[in-house]
Amino acid sequence: MKPPYEITPKILKLITSISEKIGEVNANYLTKQSPQLRKQNRIKTIHSSLKIEGNTLTEEQITALIENKRVIGPEKDVLEVLNAIKVYEKLDSFNFSSDKSFLKAHLELMNGLIESAGKYRTQGVGIVKGTIVEHIAPPFDNVPHLMKDLFEYLKDSDELTLIKSCVFHYEMEFIHPFLDGNGRMGRLWQTLILMSEYAVFEFLPFEALISKTQDDYYKSLALSDKSGKSTFFIEYMLDVIEKSLKNLLNYNNRVLKDIDRLEYFLNLGIKEFNRKDYMNVFKDLSSATASRDLKKGVEMNRLES
């Protein structure tokens, strides 16, 4: 059964804007980011997603863990990060439309943190803030059936991937299939669904914007709960995705020195190219500046003419 939601004018406008920005990303070769930028964005993703859940480690500490350096911090926080690093490094090994793959990802993400890692919950749960019960999840014996239906929905080829990713994220949070780790799994799986059609999402840290607008994130979940459909959450998440793509494009269009431009371009891995190809990546560059850049690259033995 298809989960309930409405396509509002705001959703249509955001989908149009996102599609245009993805086109610009592809035209600028931004799906092939430099290794350094990919690493930075991966760190932001892990830091932001875990920060939402109360993890106290900084981006610098996460960088150190990626580089196999020792970090002093709460044991639980360190383990959460180490698990997340392993999972995000093998993102393309998971199948977004498979519940078995979903459970495997949860097992690896929560390994050593809870006894029931990789298993759906076998007890009732509710989300309490202060003294107020914010959300009572469906009975535990309904969880396998509800999740099976949700994964069937993911296989619907008529649904837009952008919409599907948001709907899955919301419905999964509503079902609350695990005792712990639901939030980080929702964000991880939305990334995976988006990656199935758009390569840029493998390294687009939209979680950073969720972390900065956390109150709006939870408000959109609550409003969707109250209305009985995921429309509010879809609007929120599409807005986050649109702004994250805008940030990526702004970063690419920033003022760079010739060495920075050359380094960035070389990291794209384009083996044979001409001045026009170079200028396609750096849209605001004059032909004279592009020629000077490429001449400098030859003089530095970074390029062959």
Model-derived features: positions:
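FIC/Doc superfamily catalytic core
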Residues: 1-305
